[in-house]
Design a protein with these regions (language model features):
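An amphipathic, basic-hydrophobic helix/alpha-beta surface used to engage anionic
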Residues: 1-239, 281-284, 299, 303
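Residues that form generic nucleotide/phosphate-binding pockets
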Residues: 11, 153, 250-257, 327-330, ...
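Short, surface-exposed amphipathic charged segments that create phosphate/polyanion-binding patches used
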Residues: 126-128, 245, 350
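Short, charged loop segments at secondary-structure junctions
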Residues: 237-270
Length: 350
């Protein structure tokens, strides 16, 4: 068995290293016998597949001398994250299963699964016009976010636009030509409290929430609307998204971040209101609407903010959300648009 163990090897074949939630991937394990002596029983198992495929137990194969066996697997990615597919276990035994030996193989193979981005351009979202808040331009401050190109300095150009590093290199002044943005913005609060991950079902719903949020941010970028995301995670984040590069940064953030916030969502909202002038649009993305969140949103409405709520339509059996559907109806009655983001996702899929 020691000889058999030394002659055994495994390789991996895969379609890509980058996927999105909902993608189906093909992974093939190639088990090899590099020796000339057949190995009657080889139990091949991928550690990662064991956690991803329900009922997966590995494969028991016969490996002839100088032969290989291809073991194909299909995976449906339901959760975002970085997956390590590099660990494979090969357990060899003789014909009578008396002698056994195990060979653990590690090959560096990390697969990234990003949130799913849906095209919301053809979906009717009530209150869409409210997203487009005019940024206060009375100050006359230019927005220097998007560099379109570089050109030589012309008399009268704003010195703030001078590319000093490039100018020093060439011995003459060059300025940055900035691409204008639409002058519109939206403010999006995301409830990533740790309660979102209370069960396997909650984890899937949390994925829907993140998928919808990044899809909404992408819609804003495509329509040249600056988006400020306020994320209630353990490490609270304020992320501005107004370019494709910034959107990619948002995708990287959600690749590695799960719901782990400990501060109550309502307290998080209140602590960040100072960043948002009254009259601006605020979008709230939360799996459910409990009594506390309902009261805060009604107060925001009274303070002059324009509010939209994006929620998941499933009723949850816990005390905090016992009045969930009733709260949604109350918010609608006071003029707050409430949108079931799960229904939006399902419409896009059709």
């Amino acid at each position: 068995m020691c000889i058999a163990k030394k002659s055994l090897n495994a390789k991996l074949r895969y379609d890509s290293k980058i996927y999105n939630v909902g993608d189906i991937a093909n992974f093939t394990i190639i088990a090899e016998n590099l020796g000339i002596i057949p190995t009657p029983y080889v139990y091949v198992q991928s550690i990662m597949l064991r956690s991803l495929i329900e009922g997966y137990r590995g494969n028991l194969i016969f490996l002839g001398g100088d032969k290989c066996v291809w073991i194909k697997n299909k995976i449906l990615f339901t959760k975002r994250g970085i997956y390590d597919f590099g660990d494979i276990s090969l357990e060899a035994s003789d014909l009578f299963c008396i002698l056994k030996s195990v060979k653990n193989i590690h090959k560096e193979l990390y697969i990234k699964v990003y949130p799913k981005v849906y095209d919301l351009s053809n979906i009717s979202l009530s209150g869409r016009d409210c997203y487009e808040n005019r940024i206060n331009s009375k100050s006359g401050i230019d927005d220097f976010t998007l560099i379109k190109d570089i050109r030589k300095y012309n008399t009268g150009d704003n010195l703030k636009k001078v590319h000093w590093k490039l100018s020093a290199k060439h011995g003459e002044l060059y300025v940055k030509n900035f691409d204008s943005i639409s002058g519109k913005e939206c403010n999006l609060f995301m409830n990533m409290h740790i309660d979102n991950l209370g069960s396997d079902l909650f984890e899937i719903i949390e994925e829907d929430m993140v998928d919808f949020s990044v899809s909404l941010a992408k819609y804003m970028v495509n329509n040249r609307i600056r988006t400020k995301l306020f994320i209630n995670a353990k490490e609270q984040k304020n992320i501005e998204v107004e370019s494709k590069e910034a959107f990619l940064g948002l995708m990287e953030y959600f690749l590695k971040s799960k719901s782990d916030g400990t501060l109550e969502f309502t307290s998080f909202i209140k602590s960040n209101l100072r960043h948002i002038p009254k009259g601006n649009w605020i979008g709230i993305v939360s799996i459910a609407v409990d009594d506390s969140l309902r009261d805060v949103l009604m107060n925001l409405k009274e303070m002059g903010y324009r509010v939209n709520v994006f929620y998941h339509g499933k009723v949850f059996n816990n005390l905090k959300n016992v009045n969930f559907l009733k709260n949604v109806e109350l918010l609608k009655n006071v003029g707050i648009d409430c949108i079931n983001f799960k229904q939006v996702i399902e419409k896009v899929k059709q």
